[in-house]
Amino acid sequence: MKKKLVLIDGSSVAYRAFFALPLLHNDKGIHTNAVYGFTMMLNKILAEEEPTHMLVAFDAGKTTFRHEAFQEYKGGRQQTPPELSEQFPLLRELLRAYRIPAYELENYEADDIIGTLAARAEQEGFEVKVISGDRDLTQLASPHVTVDITKKGITDIEPYTPEAVREKYGLTPEQIVDLKGLMGDKSDNIPGVPGIGEKTAVKLLRQFGTVENVLASIDEIKGEKLKETLRQHREMALLSKKLAAIRRDAPVELSLDDIAYQGEDREKVVALFKELGFQSFLEKMESPSSEEEKPLAKMAFTLADRVTEEMLADKAALVVEVVEENYHDAPIVGIAVVNEHGRFFLRPETALADPQFVAWLGDETKKKSMFDSKRAAVALKWKGIELCGVSFDLLLAAYLLDPAQGVDDVAAAAKMKQYEAVRPDEAVYGKGAKRAVPDEPVLAEHLVRKAAAIWALERPFLDELRRNEQDRLLVELEQPLSSILAEMEFAGVKVDTKRLEQMGEELAEQLRTVEQRIYELAGQEFNINSPKQLGVILFEKLQLPVLKKSKTGYSTSADVLEKLAPYHEIVENILQHYRQLGKLQSTYIEGLLKVVRPDTKKVHTIFNQALTQTGRLSSTEPNLQNIPIRLEEGRKIRQAFVPSESDWLIFAADYSQIELRVLAHIAEDDNLMEAFRRDLDIHTKTAMDIFQVSEDEVTPNMRRQAKAVNFGIVYGISDYGLAQNLNISRKEAAEFIERYFESFPGVKRYMENIVQEAKQKGYVTTLLHRRRYLPDITSRNFNVRSFAERMAMNTPIQGSAADIIKKAMIDLNARLKEERLQARLLLQVHDELILEAPKEEMERLCRLVPEVMEQAVTLRVPLKVDYHYGSTWYDAK
């Protein structure tokens, strides 16, 4: 389980709670509104975030190191109302009852405690959530640190990831301190530079990166008055930045182990709530929660020592239990069957040795209802046993009803229908390193309860799917696909380990060469993988411009290095060669070699069929969908994927621009449909429109930019996002998008209509009626709402493309069997299908595969498939 640290800015949240709620007091006349609001927030965080570690930070006193640097810091702030001051001791008592550590540090602010612990936790691999009412903390946002800013109400929050910070301010989180340095902050009495507001500050920082760079480049700035102001207030700008910067190295004398969350002291919490008069919280605590472990009513079943006729009914719910996450060749620990005759538990050694039971498992006419049937099917295949006749899969049904639920066991699916007679797998097996199979009586009851739940839930799930017009999606698409994926997983993909090892040696040699070149350019040897040492070389020795600082010194992140590439050859070597080659070596070469099975010489991936919200498949252990294609060295890794038989070849077929073709169909845009019907190069056509040039005048760069516009539109991209992608101004990006919509007005109409439809219905659908619910589409938070709107635009397109390729897999599998070909599906990678087949079947596949794929569905525009074959996956291009 991923460790998660929640850090709360206690003073800020208490202040917000106090002013968000009317003055409340208990029967002793003590004011309690801030404590009440704080409790609301705590309960919400504990329920939603499930933190493993937690701390509330408070300001220690009125003076800090910032006051020493600038006496007027926070001057002019109103005194804390006495009605709030008297509640701080109660807040401390509340935290003691909840067993959440509270911490303050002399000479520092709560922000510095939070910044320091967030930095430590991130380095230790934690996910971190910061809660505050102070936007200054958005500077802490990073890939693993999210900052939730409370808004008007105490539980109404605005989440800030690095992307959200960029969306709101047009700056990175690291630049927030530079923003304060230039424009100041009235709430903290940080002066900044007189006359510079947010707009000017953002403009300067987007041009120069930091306050220091702005001050070093005054001569390049337009406007004499602005130049003079910056010269006069240079020191104040630097001081203001220093005042705004949150410390990441405060002397916090706590370890992360010290703030592990152990759960509340229930007795103390109840006693405190009674004292404070928090009746509503008391009622929630005293009423049994559906989340709590409740004793289940007894369920009668037979613990059978042999297979009997009544177990082998025409219809049954079946559980074939595999506890290990990777179910390839994993032990089956138990089997449960529930049907009209009763409930039965069978030991696997009994059931799987019985010819009648094995025949029943493989009988297509004996209908079986299961949860995640693919898992059981693959585990059985490794034992030479076939599973057929799966007529209902609860996992897939739950996934279709709401893909955002993240259903991962029978209990989670049961919860969707308020069925409570089954426990979560984690409650029985434990989790992580403590996961283990319990004694047989406990195991038997758990498996029987799971089978009984599947038996009881099939009808209500199917009824709702029918109401949603999704029953055919389950029965005709997802369930048949599950069987095909099981075959693909079990078959695996053969890997030429010698070739992979050879590539590893070649990469290692390239890395050594690049390493030596970097040392030559640096004039000394150093640890290239150390951001600290690399920062010293780049910014102190080679004097490259400092674009941003990290919590530990100079930032040497990929985005920084990309901007520095024109300044020195060493940067290109570090970024494009050393880092990329290093990742290929560690992630792909070494990573793949670790998962090749010695007995089959293959990798056996796991396709996740019920994970993404768009319906796309993903794969894990290993992830074969992210084998790199941009870098030639990365593409070469595909040379190691070879056919299973010596006289076979790899055949690859992929849909050409399927998402844009789906967009043309859904939007019914005449110009876009006409372009595809005439088989025009759609990116060239778009370039002609947005640059207003003839076909002959379209340059490769214009086509590249047009391609970014085409695919950006599919994802509901904003002018800001497009500007970032193409490294152009927002104005240019806005003009590109405007011209695109002028050329394809049907697309604009579709984008507007689909967002309105999502707001009315709460969801969007694909061509085959797959739904994606978008509860945030009406959010008052602009960033949250905008993201939901982009999902509304994209999901019908991406989801329909996913549906089409799934349908193509089913149709193709059927045709291969119908024509008695030996060819078989190996992989599905985004819009591409990979097969292997004997050489003599290639000619037939060149006709059959594109024919089947192009006829999977009928659109208003033709589907187009490109195909190639060769002795390796790399050669099939």
Swiss-Prot record:
<dbReference type="InterPro" id="IPR002298">
    <property type="entry name" value="DNA_polymerase_A"/>
</dbReference>
<dbReference type="InterPro" id="IPR043502">
    <property type="entry name" value="DNA/RNA_pol_sf"/>
</dbReference>
<dbReference type="GO" id="GO:0003887">
    <property type="term" value="F:DNA-directed DNA polymerase activity"/>
</dbReference>
<dbReference type="InterPro" id="IPR020045">
    <property type="entry name" value="DNA_polI_H3TH"/>
</dbReference>
<dbReference type="GO" id="GO:0008409">
    <property type="term" value="F:5'-3' exonuclease activity"/>
</dbReference>
<keyword id="KW-0548">Nucleotidyltransferase</keyword>
<dbReference type="GO" id="GO:0008408">
    <property type="term" value="F:3'-5' exonuclease activity"/>
</dbReference>
<keyword id="KW-0235">DNA replication</keyword>
<dbReference type="Pfam" id="PF02739">
    <property type="entry name" value="5_3_exonuc_N"/>
</dbReference>
<dbReference type="InterPro" id="IPR054690">
    <property type="entry name" value="DNA_polI_exonuclease"/>
</dbReference>
<dbReference type="Pfam" id="PF22619">
    <property type="entry name" value="DNA_polI_exo1"/>
</dbReference>
<dbReference type="InterPro" id="IPR002421">
    <property type="entry name" value="5-3_exonuclease"/>
</dbReference>
<dbReference type="Pfam" id="PF00476">
    <property type="entry name" value="DNA_pol_A"/>
</dbReference>
<dbReference type="Pfam" id="PF01367">
    <property type="entry name" value="5_3_exonuc"/>
</dbReference>
<comment type="similarity">
    <text>Belongs to the DNA polymerase type-A family.</text>
</comment>
<keyword id="KW-0227">DNA damage</keyword>
<keyword id="KW-0808">Transferase</keyword>
<dbReference type="InterPro" id="IPR008918">
    <property type="entry name" value="HhH2"/>
</dbReference>
<dbReference type="GO" id="GO:0006302">
    <property type="term" value="P:double-strand break repair"/>
</dbReference>
<keyword id="KW-0239">DNA-directed DNA polymerase</keyword>
<keyword id="KW-0378">Hydrolase</keyword>
<feature type="domain" description="3'-5' exonuclease">
    <location>
        <begin position="311"/>
        <end position="465"/>
    </location>
</feature>
<comment type="function">
    <text>In addition to polymerase activity, this DNA polymerase exhibits 3'-5' and 5'-3' exonuclease activity.</text>
</comment>
<protein>
    <recommendedName>
        <fullName>DNA polymerase I</fullName>
        <ecNumber>2.7.7.7</ecNumber>
    </recommendedName>
</protein>
<dbReference type="InterPro" id="IPR020046">
    <property type="entry name" value="5-3_exonucl_a-hlix_arch_N"/>
</dbReference>
<dbReference type="InterPro" id="IPR029060">
    <property type="entry name" value="PIN-like_dom_sf"/>
</dbReference>
<comment type="subunit">
    <text>Single-chain monomer with multiple functions.</text>
</comment>
<dbReference type="InterPro" id="IPR012337">
    <property type="entry name" value="RNaseH-like_sf"/>
</dbReference>
<dbReference type="GO" id="GO:0003677">
    <property type="term" value="F:DNA binding"/>
</dbReference>
<dbReference type="GO" id="GO:0006261">
    <property type="term" value="P:DNA-templated DNA replication"/>
</dbReference>
<keyword id="KW-0540">Nuclease</keyword>
<keyword id="KW-0269">Exonuclease</keyword>
<dbReference type="InterPro" id="IPR019760">
    <property type="entry name" value="DNA-dir_DNA_pol_A_CS"/>
</dbReference>
<feature type="domain" description="5'-3' exonuclease">
    <location>
        <begin position="1"/>
        <end position="310"/>
    </location>
</feature>
<dbReference type="InterPro" id="IPR036279">
    <property type="entry name" value="5-3_exonuclease_C_sf"/>
</dbReference>
<feature type="region of interest" description="Polymerase">
    <location>
        <begin position="469"/>
        <end position="877"/>
    </location>
</feature>
<dbReference type="InterPro" id="IPR018320">
    <property type="entry name" value="DNA_polymerase_1"/>
</dbReference>
<dbReference type="InterPro" id="IPR002562">
    <property type="entry name" value="3'-5'_exonuclease_dom"/>
</dbReference>
<keyword id="KW-0238">DNA-binding</keyword>
<keyword id="KW-0234">DNA repair</keyword>
<dbReference type="InterPro" id="IPR036397">
    <property type="entry name" value="RNaseH_sf"/>
</dbReference>
<dbReference type="InterPro" id="IPR001098">
    <property type="entry name" value="DNA-dir_DNA_pol_A_palm_dom"/>
</dbReference>
